[in-house]
């Protein structure tokens, strides 16, 4: 929900889409990140129409102001992870311990 083009309420995970659509979005985001060689924290945004067709709209290769919502949902400190990844730690290292996207 937005007010004056600023997000004031965020629902996460999105309650209005099916698991099938959620999986399509996740798979698309992972494919894009692999394709461009992106290996750090970022946000990919999708729109979904009434028939649940997802459309990619943008990628923000940075931590957004709403990152605290993601941290609450996932239990992952994104800022620390971003620094560790920049230092060369892989996601599945014991320091970061994100072994698969399914764990998030």
Model-derived features with residue positions:
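ATP-dependent carboxylate activation and anion-phosphoryl transfer catalytic cores
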Residues: 1-104
């Amino acid at each position: 929900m937005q007010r004056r083009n600023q997000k004031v309420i965020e629902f996460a995970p999105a309650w209005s889409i099916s698991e099938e659509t959620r999986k399509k979005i996740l798979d698309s985001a992972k494919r894009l990140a692999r394709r461009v060689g992106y290996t750090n924290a970022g946000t990919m945004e999708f729109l979904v129409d009434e028939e649940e067709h997802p459309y990619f709209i943008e990628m923000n290769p940075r931590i957004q102001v709403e990152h605290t919502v993601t941290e609450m949902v996932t239990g992952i400190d994104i800022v620390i992870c971003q620094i560790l990844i920049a230092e060369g730690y892989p996601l599945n290292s014991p320091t970061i311990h994100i072994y698969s996207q399914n764990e998030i």
